[in-house]
Amino acid sequence: MNGVQDSTSAAASSQSAQRQVRVQLVSKQEDIALPESTGPILVPTGLRRYALSTLVNNLLGNDKPVPFEFLINGAFLRTSIDEYLTANGISAETTLEIEYIRALIPPLHIASFEHDDWVGSVDVLSATSLATSWASAVVSPGQERILSGSYDGLLRVWNMSSQIVATSPSPADGGHGASIKAAKFISPNSIVSAGLDRTVRLWKYNESDDGFSGKITPQIELYGHKSGINSLAVHAPSNRILSASSDHSIGFWSTKKSDAPAAPENLVPSAASRSSKRRKVSSSVSIPQRGPLALLSSHTAPVSAAIFDTNDSTVGYSTSWDHSLRTWDLVTAALVDTRSTSHSLLSLEHLPEHHLLATGTSARHITLIDPRTSATTISAMTLRGHTNAVVSLSRDPHSSYGLISGSHDGTCRIWDIRATKTDNDGVVGESVYSITRRSLEEQGKADAKRVGGEGVKVFSVCWDRSVGIVSAGEDKRIQINRGEGVLSSA
């Protein structure tokens, strides 16, 4: 009986290998695209990714083979062509268009910067970062800066040699009085931060001519929240900031002192309190205090994240522990739309090219939501792979399809929303690469199972085109990983 099965299987394999199909190989990346004169090619339907990759390399005349991935109708080919045709009911008489892209290059560990306490937030200033482009500034290669906000209440600016260029002042001199959970560059000379002391603080940042030392100087203290602040978003062209707070509200602020209203008196520390907390120096520290342009109140639980629409800064989005994603008109401070889900939403990122918002959840997955009122379903796709809460998200600067997530399971995962399958839960995506904490590897515990990511929880991740993937968390480190062109550009 086994012999009959084996011969039948062999015959089927032989038949599939002998079948042929016309394929049109295309690429959106000009540097690897075949000449337009390259027409459809007749290939065996038994070909898989490796054989197709060899074929493309031969057609391109590459001396050094480049690994490629292949997509049909926007989805990765994970089987033979024959199996794909059968599964999708497509005739082998059809000319099949197959798109090829560079395969994933695993992001390698570049460096780690050690802190004295947990690191709650990271951001990058580079030639390709938003803060640089907004200011029409220039950051030369090697002069990139990394900003960290720590649970010790201090901001630090680092160079790429893991040296601290500047540290923010103590509470006595205008610094934060509690843990920092969010910090961002507004421009090469301006920083904003917030945390558990309920304040949003604006800072001036300057460096010496040689770039070896710098100064973070307090500029404005913004009061309005009645509980800790979990995240920040900035839009420098409009001089606006969004803050997400555990007091269930979103703060909408101006970076310009002249535009901002007075700070609420009931939230500003009294003069007596301030003088007792701040030691006397040659001249007492006097920092302007301002209030919010608006407080957006509709959520019924802590707000985890608030961001600007990438293409329209008058639109904002927020996520909350109340399971909802909300859309706001920032001009009128009005609630526009509410999308309710089944889980607490802990992080948020915009994928504008696909009209999607990525939301990290307490249920260990990422839900992609179409915020447009015309959308008929709440969840467009679910990304699964993490084993604990997903608390930070950052889009891939190289590809509109890419995303990275940071989780309390101690990993960052790279996603390509084209890498999907369909099951009982609908369209489900799987991560294409997982980045573990270097601190575990150095302890010889890279394969150790950490319950809930104990000791290595990731709190923040930022993906920068120039610097790479920068993450930070409970292991008191910033970690930098880089893989050139991790996903295809598109």
UniProtKB/Swiss-Prot annotation:
Matching Pfam families, A to Z?
Answer: NLE (PF08154), WD40 (PF00400)
Q: Which regions are annotated as WD repeats? A: 129-168, 175-213, 224-263, 298-338, 340-379, 385-425, 453-490
Q: How does it assemble?
A: Component of the NOP7 complex, composed of erb1, nop7 and ytm1. The complex is held together by erb1, which interacts with nop7 via its N-terminal domain and with ytm1 via a high-affinity interaction between the seven-bladed beta-propeller domains of the 2 proteins. The NOP7 complex associates with the 66S pre-ribosome. Interacts (via UBL domain) with mdn1 (via VWFA/MIDAS domain).
Q: Which organism is it from?
A: Aspergillus niger (strain ATCC MYA-4892 / CBS 513.88 / FGSC A1513)
Q: Does Nucleus show up as a keyword for this record?
A: yes
Q: Has the keyword rRNA processing been applied to this entry?
A: yes
Signal sequence region: none
Q: Which keywords has UniProt assigned to this entry? A: Nucleus, Repeat, Ribosome biogenesis, rRNA processing, WD repeat
* Organism superkingdom: Eukaryota
Against InterPro entries, the record matches this protein to: G-protein_beta_WD-40_rep, NLE, WD40/YVTN_repeat-like_dom_sf, WD40_repeat_CS, WD40_repeat_dom_sf, WD40_rpt, WDR12/Ytm1
Function of the protein: Component of the NOP7 complex, which is required for maturation of the 25S and 5.8S ribosomal RNAs and formation of the 60S ribosome.
Could you tell me which residues belong to the region Ubiquitin-like (UBL) domain?
21-102
According to the UniProt record, where is the region Disordered?
A: 257-285
Q: Which gene encodes it?
A: ytm1
Q: Where in the cell is it found?
A: Nucleus, Nucleolus; Nucleus, Nucleoplasm
Which Gene Ontology BP annotations are present? chromosome organization; maturation of 5.8S rRNA from tricistronic rRNA transcript (SSU-rRNA, 5.8S rRNA, LSU-rRNA); maturation of LSU-rRNA from tricistronic rRNA transcript (SSU-rRNA, 5.8S rRNA, LSU-rRNA); protein-RNA complex remodeling
Q: Name one GO cellular component term.
A: PeBoW complex
Q: Which family does it belong to?
A: Belongs to the WD repeat WDR12/YTM1 family.
One Gene Ontology MF term: ribonucleoprotein complex binding
Q: What is its main location?
A: nucleus
Protein name, UniProt field: Ribosome biogenesis protein ytm1
